[in-house]
């Protein structure tokens, strides 16, 4: 019953047939007050660095700073970004936009960095495409594929200047280079990376998932640990498992307990607290949430990884009361009986 409910509630989309975690990152950095700057583009697939391009201050052009993997062949990748990942386009857009942000009256201390992150991750029943902008290390805005524009994240608004607004004279190309990938093409691109890397990079490794609790008075921190997994991308959704019980409620939706973060499950930056284990391509992640201790056995983690079917994981050491999962009768019928 519970497993079936999770499958129904999961975001079911077409996904590639194996692990695919693709991230392009563009970072613009002001180095000093003399307007000297740096710009870097990185391409990672399943945590493997494919290319790192850095601005050559003497030539003003991108320069490759690493040796790409021998298996990498960009001619076999659909929708692969041309012109060195559109290096000069994003350099100019991000430079202009950060300059406009720093000129705003509300900007008391000028920002030094701006990053654009584009990509997607396949977590079986959870396919996430993302495109977002961070300024000064904090996420400012996310590209909304439904409305085809940047939108605010939960905790803040964002200045509609430069490349962040549909009024930009370059908006058509922003949509071409960013919008199309976030909205549509990223999973196909990631699938091509997977096909050409097959046999050359490590196979996905299924994590062991365990939920433990750290009790401090009236509150308990639940930790959903993914141990020894590859690639690094994981996500969790927290639910009150009593919502899955067949009882008197008529609400067809199960409410997710949202962690306090501006990132979406599966995005880089989502608070999974992921670290690499030694020199191997193995990772451990420990997303967490704080709940009232009385709820510690009722709140469950649904874990997502490219090797996992979504499953419910409950705390193994919590002291809260056990959840009530049996059928409790039909409130509507009870009320009708009282009226009779």
UniProtKB/Swiss-Prot annotation:
Residue spans crossing the bilayer: none
Location of the Ig-like domain: 207-294
Keywords: Immunoglobulin domain
A Pfam family annotated for this UniProt entry: 2L_N_poxvirus
Record protein name field: Putative Ig-like domain-containing protein C1
Organism of provenance: Swinepox virus (strain Kasza) (SWPV)
